């Protein structure tokens, strides 16, 4: 084992899709058969080389392992599935002739094929990133395959960069996995920990043979409350004690992003690992805990630059924090991001200062520069970096004085909210008032969006470029809405949607119509696989655009047009306050509760205008409700209180005859089922197809809302058969009363194409008719 010192400045991850989404485009071309595997790999290498160039230009060094090998073709957890060939029996045909996962097989697990359903996907801790959930059984074979790591090492070698491989650690892997179908009821993937520790030890040995001197093992799973925290701490001590005992291995950095290690901190410190990363932004550590790191002789990698938000760091304050850390004066502290920078866009320099408040912002490349500056200040003293500190102070002062940040009328309105503003009559009263909707048993509907075709994107791009007028764009969009309504009528759906052709993104669309937001041109962030979003920047007080405190309606013209084309009810479609916050970069100068209530009141104004226009069913989507749930149980009640209340503030002023729907996806719901119930919606649709309706077992009899468990997994290109949907419906009926069930896809259809959509919806409607006939 080498004794190469850990670098003074580092990051624990970086955006992987490319500054201009080069990887996304190459992935999708490969999946469509328009690019070869070699062309995809060439693009991947280009993305990695650009990464090396950007971070070294920002201040990291190419020769000291400060740069992690952070690239992934799809997902970092799926990378470990490939590393160990963790293929469940039901997906065995994804393996190649060697019994390993090559890239096509890797993608098959992620996306499914005509014959293979994909792995389940869920949220990565409390972020907006999604990971593929490994399925591990008692007999799942472990077979090493370092091809992906070797590919990254070779690209780095050719670029003259010494990288440290970045691998999801064994505890996070197993704690985040699920038991393979057919496993014994009492089996858990963690039961096989010792076998996996041995497999990881083999990986470390092979990395040492390749000349690797540092490796990064990511253990965010140790910052989460578990059923038995003490037991997890014992497992952490056992795991890393065994890995550190290896005679032939790289030095080990363990990272702990997203929260606090708590009882896992002393467990790790006694194992013999060389370096430990602590998230000092989202985690809370006492002076004694920080002193214990230094006392154990473990190098502290201090995550002081926020890896999850886009605000410029107060580098002067951060430097003082670093200087006060035990061991800092002896060189036992390095400067890092709090988390991987995969959660923020690539480069603020790509944005127009007239459109975004650049004085207050830092994207990935700027955060790397902040880290390098702090490391220099820590090593050389504050005076050595005073010019840079002064420039940062001045930028933050300009941002604080920005008049767009504060509106006294908005603040007064939010402060005047009373408890009555959060309440609606009982569900029985509302159902009686909504009976004249005359919906059948098992009403069929979709979640909201329809495919965003190339033609739609072309028209929007031409309007932005001034090639067509706003009137021409609106005329095209009205025709597109008419086409979507006609298709739904032909398919026989019961409750229709207008398809959201006018929206580029379910949060950005609202940001573009609300005061207090800025939107970016190139601020892309990976959500999963090739799916990227452009989170908006919420930096000021919020209301709808337009004169007065209420502003002007912006969804009403589209919904009214759609409703005029059908006798069936057409849903008004809004994104809820929690999701708008979760999928934006949110101001950090006031409590989230206050910001959420401002957004909720703006949405309440829009809902009132939809009602006035005759829209009887209004859906307020909250797919991110679970996402923001704190990782530690003692911090969760406060969040659930304000998040539920913000939804109720947005929706509680409606008439009893107006049916409020909500939609949740990408989540493990069992922990918050009571809070979902407390939303007090009339109908709740949830993602359920990939989990085969398993989550319905957690829904109590006291659940008051109608329920639409998804019967079609829209995150995969495969078309479910009618029989498959019937099977899921029968399973759903087994969990609840037929009168309360709705039939719908898992999520919106924006990312699907029309051929898949038509076939799948036809099967959905036919399956529903067959089930109705059998009742």
Q: What spans do the regions from the language model cover?
A:
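Domain-level signal for soluble alpha/beta catalytic cores
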Residues: 1-775
């Amino acid at each position: 084992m080498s004794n190469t010192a850990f670098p003074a400045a580092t990051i624990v991850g970086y955006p992987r899709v490319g500054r201009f989404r080069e990887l996304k485009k190459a992935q999708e071309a490969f999946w469509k058969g328009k690019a070869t595997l070699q062309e995809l790999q060439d693009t991947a290498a280009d993305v990695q080389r650009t990464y090396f160039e950007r971070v070294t230009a920002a201040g990291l060094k190419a020769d000291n392992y400060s740069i992690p090998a952070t690239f992934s073709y799809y997902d970092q957890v799926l990378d470990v599935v490939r590393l160990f060939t963790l293929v469940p029996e039901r997906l065995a045909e994804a393996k190649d002739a060697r019994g390993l996962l090559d890239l096509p097989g890797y993608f098959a697990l992620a996306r499914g094929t005509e014959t293979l359903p994909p792995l389940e996907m869920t949220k990565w801790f409390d972020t907006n990133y999604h990971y593929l959930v490994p399925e591990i059984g008692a007999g799942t074979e472990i077979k090493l395959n370092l091809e992906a790591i070797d590919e990254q090492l070779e690209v780095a070698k050719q670029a003259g960069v010494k990288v440290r491989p970045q691998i999801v650690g064994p505890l996070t892997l197993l704690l985040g996995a699920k038991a393979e179908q057919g496993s014994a009821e009492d089996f858990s993937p963690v039961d096989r920990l010792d076998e996996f520790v041995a497999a990881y030890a083999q990986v470390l040995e092979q990395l040492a043979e390749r000349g690797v001197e540092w490796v990064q093992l990511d253990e965010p799973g140790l910052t989460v409350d578990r059923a038995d925290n003490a037991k997890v701490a014992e497992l952490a001590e056992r795991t890393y004690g065994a890995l550190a005992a290896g005679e032939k291995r790289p030095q080990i950095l363990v990272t702990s992003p997203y929260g606090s290690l708590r009882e896992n901190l002393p467990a790790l410190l006694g194992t013999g690992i060389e370096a430990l990363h602590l998230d000092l932004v989202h985690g809370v550590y006492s002076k004694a805990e920080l002193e214990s790191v230094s006392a154990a002789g473990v190098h502290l990698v201090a995550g002081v630059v926020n890896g999850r938000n886009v605000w410029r760091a107060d580098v002067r304050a951060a430097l003082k924090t670093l200087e006060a850390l035990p061991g800092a004066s002896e060189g036992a502290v390095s400067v890092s991001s709090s988390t991987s920078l995969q959660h923020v866009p690539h480069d603020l320099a790509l944005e127009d200062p007239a459109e975004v408040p650049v004085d207050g912002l830092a994207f990935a490349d700027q955060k790397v520069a902040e880290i390098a500056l702090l490391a220099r200040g820590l090593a050389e003293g504050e005076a050595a970096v005073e010019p840079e500190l002064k420039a940062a102070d001045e930028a933050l002062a300009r941002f604080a004085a920005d008049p767009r940040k504060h509106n006294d009328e908005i603040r007064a309105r939010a402060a005047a909210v009373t408890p009555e503003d959060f309440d609606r009559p009982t569900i029985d009263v509302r159902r009686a008032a909504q009976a004249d909707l005359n919906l059948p048993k098992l009403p069929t509907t979709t979640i909201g969006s329809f495919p965003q075709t190339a033609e739609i994107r072309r028209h929007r791009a031409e309007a932005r470029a001034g090639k067509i007028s706003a009137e021409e764009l609106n005329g095209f969009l009205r025709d597109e809405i008419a086409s979507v309504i006609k298709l739904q009528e032909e398919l026989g759906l019961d409750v229709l949607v207008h398809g959201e052709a006018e929206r580029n993104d379910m949060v950005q669309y609202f940001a573009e119509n609300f005061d207090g937001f800025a939107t970016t041109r190139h601020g892309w962030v990976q959500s999963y696989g090739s799916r990227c979003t452009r989170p908006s920047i919420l930096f000021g007080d919020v209301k709808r655009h337009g004169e007065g405190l209420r502003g002007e309606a912006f969804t009403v013209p589209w919904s009214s047009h759609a409703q005029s084309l059908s006798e069936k009810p057409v849903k008004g479609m809004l994104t809820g306050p929690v999701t708008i916050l979760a999928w934006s970069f949110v101001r950090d100068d006031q409590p989230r509760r206050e910001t959420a209530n401002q957004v909720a009141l703006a949405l309440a104004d829009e809902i009132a205008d939809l009602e006035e226009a005759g829209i009887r069913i209004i859906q307020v989507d909250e797919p991110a409700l679970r996402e923001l749930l704190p990782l530690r149980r003692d911090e969760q009640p406060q969040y659930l209180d304000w998040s539920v209340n913000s939804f109720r503030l947005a929706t509680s002023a409606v008439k009893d005859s107006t049916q409020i729907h909500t939609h949740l996806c990408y989540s493990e719901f069992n922990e918050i089922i009571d809070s979902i119930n407390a939303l007090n919606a009339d109908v709740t649709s949830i993602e359920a197809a990939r989990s085969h309706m398993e989550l319905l077992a957690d829904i109590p009899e006291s659940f008051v809302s109608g329920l639409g468990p998804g019967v079609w997994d829209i995150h995969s290109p495969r078309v479910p058969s009618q029989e498959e949907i019937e099977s899921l419906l029968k399973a759903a009926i087994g969990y609840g009363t037929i009168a309360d069930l709705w039939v719908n896809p898992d999520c919106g259809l924006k990312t699907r194409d029309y051929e898949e959509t038509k076939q799948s919806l036809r099967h959905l409607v036919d399956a529903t008719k067959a089930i109705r006939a059998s009742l």
